[in-house]
Amino acid sequence: MLSKRIIPCLDVRDGRLTKGIKFQGNVDIGDPVESARRYYEQGADEIVFYDITASHEGRGIFLDIVEKVASSIFIPFSVGGGINTVDDMRDALNAGAEKVSVNSGAVKDPDIISKGAARFGSQAIVLGMDVKRVAPTEAIPSGYEIVIHGGRKHMGMDALDWAKTAEVLGAGEICVNSIDADGTKDGYELTLTRMISDAVQIPVIASGGAGHPAHMYDALTKGGASAALIASIVHYGEYTIPDLKKQIQAMGCKMRLTW
């Protein structure tokens, strides 16, 4: 059995680490470079960096921060936010990222996934999906809709269909973020995570809602996810990554332990 992954997520606004609830009320909680280094030293399996306002503001990602984070850690590092072209992908990868996460840019231009995969390999292309629960309709039969620009714009796209399409286009991984659960610490959206995990053959990362090791265990088992993205649970010092991994492994889910 492959070890499951724990991935701290750094949401960055104006060069600072922030966190909100359901993509609202973000507060400054520190320096993203220092936080990345701390999580790396604690045993994080990967780090994800999101420039959370780049797409909405129509600008590129903060490459200087990407470079600083990349030079401070020696684990896989994914960046997202403002990745709208293959050149944006190239710039992020050249700055030190191993993977790029496309979200709003891929919704607007799905071919960016296939172009990026052809140039850099599928392993470097992550589809980020921001999803809201809605009443099922003919256009959205799964009851989960794709939203972009930090949840500000509803796209009328079915999340399940989009995940399948992205896999065909060449995405190597999908990060499924429930905006309904984001920052609540009430647990991941397991129905959504399981639905996507069962529908695709590529790894799925569960995102949004971690408040306890049991939530992560559920996402990695009941939800079928390969990895759990976390933020508030470690940003505010409630748990360290060793705490989380030990408890999750004790529940019966294999983790990579480095201490």
Swiss-Prot record:
Q: Note whether Cytoplasm occurs among the keywords.
A: yes
Family named by the database record: Belongs to the HisA/HisF family.
Q: Provide the E.C. number(s) assigned to this enzyme.
A: 4.3.2.10
Q: Provide the Gene Ontology terms for cellular component.
A: cytoplasm
The record's keywords, sorted A to Z, are: Amino-acid biosynthesis, Cytoplasm, Histidine biosynthesis, Lyase
| Entry superkingdom | Bacteria
Q: Where in the cell is it found?
A: Cytoplasm
Question: What name is this protein filed under?
Answer: Imidazole glycerol phosphate synthase subunit HisF
Classification via HAMAP family = HisF
What CDD domains is this protein classified in? HisF
